[in-house]
Every structure is written in structure tokens, then in C-alpha cells.
């Protein structure tokens, strides 16, 4: 598969086909090619001997997709940075990545960034001034060069930049198109922010098949009336989201085949797909295929998949996450470093061309999580699971990293920033489950000196500080105040005791 060439061919074959829609804004494949070519030409002219990654800032604007392709055509990996990411985190991403340039599809509110900022108006000027110029195809990202870098939660308090190469992305996209039976010219839901790698599951399978990406932004999701009005207009055929988002949509009685009559495929990734959610979807969309998938950011979106049928639902209360893609393999490793037999739990290790080359600028973290097995890259996921008859079953995290509403986060990172807040002496984050999946985060806090008369005022003050340091999805929903944190005999936080206390 030649990824960029496949996307480019639609600009020739179906130039007026819509590539991306967001509210009232849309771009065709012709415009996508012309503007990304113009941008790539400008980047190559402005930075002729440089291959540093480029930050791309915004939310669901069509210019985000143009910027992504412009970067890689000029030989630079892109780093998607969503508007919701706090200034402090954006600053740390800029410093860690070594980026020299930030392309903005929206107003940048972060100050003192160590990068050159190209504003929305600057971009329009570049698209106009360099229109008709084509970049040298030899400059484009290829092989084991980084295509994109996505920053995920890190236990040290600093986000980790996961490097995904061109070859990684080709491996994923080829598998997704073939195994999920995606067709030419379909409409794909684009719900996940671009800084979340679930978005890759719809972006590139859509673009290489001449599809249309239909973007739903966070404001729509916060206003169900707007959300369902948009969905009714969309004619979506391929639905890509976390199970949580689909579960929220199912609360609306009209969310069914009558709203989306041409729905063909549901693709789920990012968290556990509950049996009851899949069952409701089959009832509402009897003609659609439901695919449950699994994979960490470090292995390029997903590496397993299974068609969830009524027979599968009847057979498994907790759904399997699927069979491994053909060019990769799964190993279940026991604590002693040996491979577990069929049916025995251990750590899921992914081997093959989907695996990242490591964390940008973090050799120690890379060495800890990545290795080589039989000459191939391998990633130690930290996820517990087992394989039975070729099917992978996921059993949660081995450490304190969890997935909440599709977002992966390390509890230690949240604790790190919580303990740095004013009025906090000590703190532990306890993830609270509802059924099979995590529902919310509870912060157990030992408060420092403060003058607040009411606990809710103290909580508001702490949350205000956290909002400056962490994305909204990492802010604990509830706070509990105690005089001390229980400890185990060896001096570690007794998380099991805490969990039993707060759920009693």
C-alpha cells in the first residue's frame, strides 16, 4: 500500500468528492491535495535541511487534515495538539519534541512556546501564495520515518511521545480496510479528537478509500440536540468511537437504523465493549456489523478484531477483543519471562510491524517498554490477558494505568499533579468501576492548611489548579478528604484497602 498516493488518486478520480465535513465547513479531495501540496512546498522552502516534527494545533477544523498531510509530504512527522490540552502540557510537548514550528487551525492561547507559530491567516496566505506548487515526492515521509507522534499520559508527570512510522500506519490501514471490509466512498464518523489515536482508525481508512469524514466536536457532544441533528444529516456508514460514546447515543430512542439507514460497520476501540451495549446496537442496527478491537497507541491504534454477533454475545459475558492481524503476533508473558500456555493469564506483548519505534527523546522509557523478539519490534503493553483458540481476552491493567471513557491515563501522573496543588498534603487516585469498566476517578486527599469553610469550596480551588495542568478527562469527578492515607507494611499506599473503604 502506498498511502499518500492512494489519497492523492481521489483528487484526480473524484476531485469534487467531499473529504472532510465539520459543521458548515468542508473540503474536497481536490482542495485537500492543492492546499496540502502548497503547505508542503512552503515547509520544504522554509526548512530545507530540517526534519523536526511539527505541532498541529486545533480541534476538528478541516485545516487539521490539510496540515497533517502537508507535514508528511514535506518529510516531517506531525504532532496533533487538541485545543482542550492545558497550556502547561502543550509547553512540555513542545520542549520534549524539539518542534520548531506550530501550524494552527485555531487561535493559539498558549504563550511563550519555543516554536514559530503559523496562524490561521498565515495558513490561508500560504495556501494562496504557493497554490500550484507541488512538493518533491522524494521528501515525503516513508519507511521507518515517523509519520505522526501522539503524546500519551506518563507516570513521571511528563507526557510520552509515541512515534508511529509510515510503515506502522500502512500496516494498520491495510489491515483495517481489508479485515473490516471497508468500501469505496463511505461516510466515516470522526468523533475522537486528533490527539487521541482512535481518530487514526477513521482518518486514514477513509482517505485511502475516497471516503468522507464527518466530524463531531466536543460542543456537539455536550449538546445532544445538536449531536443528533448532525447525525441525522450525516448518512454515516462507518462508525468509529469508544463504546462509551455509543452507549451515550443509545440513550436517545431515535438512535437507530431509522436515523442512520445506511450504517454498515461499527468499529470500537479504546476501552471495554460491554456485552449489553453490543446487544442493544444489534437490536437498533440489525443490518450493521459490530467490530470489537484492541490495541495500545504504541502498536498503532489496534491489532486485534472480532465480529460481534448474537452468538458471540451469548457465548461470552465479557467479550473477547479479537484475533490478531496477520502480520503481527501476540505473546502472553508470565512473570518469570516465559510464554504462558493457552488460557493462562499474563502480560500481553505485541510483536510485529505495527509496533512503535519508541518514545521520542526518552531512551530509558523506551528500553523499559520495547524490545526485539526474533528480529521484530515488540511492545510490552502492561495489559493483562490470555489467548484461547486464537482469541485474545483483555483483563485490565497490570499497573495503575487505566482507560476511562476511551482515554488512557496513568494514575501516578494525576497524583503527581494533585500533590503539587495548594492545599494538598497527600493524595491518591482511586478509579471507580461500574460493571466491567471504569466510570469515574475519585481523589482521596489529605488536605493541607486552608481557610475554606466548606469542602466543596476546597474542591473547587483544587480543581481550578488541576485544570491548568491536566486535560479535563483526567480531572477526578469526586473528592474525599481524610486525615491520612493507609499504607501497607512495606510503606506503599494500600490501594486495596482504600478501594474497599470508598466502595463499602
Swiss-Prot record:
NCBIfam families: AA-adenyl-dom, D-ala-DACP-lig, PRK04813.1
GO biological process: lipoteichoic acid biosynthetic process
GO terms assigned for molecular function: ATP binding; D-alanine [D-alanyl carrier protein] ligase activity
InterPro entries according to UniProt: AA_adenyl_dom, AMP-bd_C, AMP-bd_C_sf, AMP-binding_CS, AMP-dep_synth/lig_dom, ANL_N_sf, DltA, DltA-like
E.C. code: 6.2.1.54
Pfam families: AMP-binding, AMP-binding_C
Protein name: D-alanine--D-alanyl carrier protein ligase
Enzyme class, spelled out: ligase
Entry function: Catalyzes the first step in the D-alanylation of lipoteichoic acid (LTA), the activation of D-alanine and its transfer onto the D-alanyl carrier protein (Dcp) DltC. In an ATP-dependent two-step reaction, forms a high energy D-alanyl-AMP intermediate, followed by transfer of the D-alanyl residue as a thiol ester to the phosphopantheinyl prosthetic group of the Dcp. D-alanylation of LTA plays an important role in modulating the properties of the cell wall in Gram-positive bacteria, influencing the net charge of the cell wall.
Pathway: Cell wall biogenesis; lipoteichoic acid biosynthesis
Chief localization: cytoplasm
Reaction equations catalysed: holo-[D-alanyl-carrier protein] + D-alanine + ATP = D-alanyl-[D-alanyl-carrier protein] + AMP + diphosphate
Subcellular location: Cytoplasm
Family the entry assigns: Belongs to the ATP-dependent AMP-binding enzyme family. DltA subfamily.
Source taxon at top rank: Bacteria
Binding-site list for D-alanine: 197, 301, 492
Positions contributing to ATP binding: 152-153, 292-297, 383, 394-397, 492
Keywords, ordered alphabetically: ATP-binding, Cytoplasm, Ligase, Nucleotide-binding
Gene label: dltA
GO CC, alphabetical: cytoplasm
